[in-house]
Amino acid sequence: MKKQEFLDALGAGLSGSSDAEEVLDFYREMIEDRMEDGMEEGAAVEQLGAVEEILARCVQGLTVPKAVCETTAGSGISRVEIREKEFDVTVCEGTEDTYRLEESSEGYHDVTLENGVLRIVRNKRQPERRLFFSASGELTLYLPKGQIQALDVTTCSGDMEVRKDFETVHVTGASSDVTLSGSYSGKVAIQTASGDVTLEGVFAGPLELQTSSGSQELKGRFHSGKLRAASGDIEVAQASVTEDLAVETASGDVELTNVKAQELRLRSASGDIQLERICAELLAIESRSGDMELQQVLAKEEFLCRSTSGDISLTGCDAPKMGFATVSGDITGSLLHGKRFSSRTVSGDIHLPGGTPEGECAISTVSGDANLRVEE
């Protein structure tokens, strides 16, 4: 979808609202900022999400109040909505039963608390622009203690840091870095273009992350996750995943260290994949030209790797059922225990240890070589 098509559809959904033009201006600027960062027009629009989802999130907050509230009783807050452009935003826990908003520059935000929804909206006031001066600022929101039901943030270039417990979190940004540290019992969804995403804490609901050139770093306890990046790297360390973790990149590298998961699925086009000290019920890895370096990777059921031209290197890996397939990539390294080995190749050299009655390991190449040994 093109920019104008997106804006026309959004405008139709906002028909009759006195603040529709302000909302359209906001999303128009988001698309243009992403295109300035090098994204194609269609990709910049797609990053914002479906028009229906945007309308569902913002239609209740279209009437923008004009009175700024700095310190107000915070009881009854169930949802926080922030619509920002260039200010860095920090959301954290206060010490009283109030919410407090601190701005580095006053007068740039309209605030209201109505029917349990706290809304902070960047107004049309423009910062003074000078040569070599970046029009930005800081916005800090202090919230009452306890978990709040939902946080919904849309921003352009300002960074976003959340040090507060919520049930659900939805963040959409362009060049914004996003950092979450806390406990989140529901779904967490974050989309950025060039911004980095850093997560640490307890994420008890489904997690969805999508970046273009931005990197992703995760640490903590997770229910399940879907991580996608184009050229950005993805790193997961010191993490436990109750159910499934799916990771997909184009040219970005993937690095997992000390991770336990029910099911682990990794896919990369040209990015390298590096795993160390991994345990999963099922492990499936796929790459075209990226190399795989796997150390102390264990699967309780199946361990499957497929590559086109990338090499597969194994050190102390094992599973009851293993399979490795390449076209021109080589397969080398060691397994912890012997297997019933089977192999096939067109022109590659295959060197495998003697077979044992326990476990299976299938090797397949076209021109790639295979050389495996057993450590026991």
Write out the residue ranges for each language-model feature.
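Intrinsically disordered, low-complexity terminal regions
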Residues: M1-E376
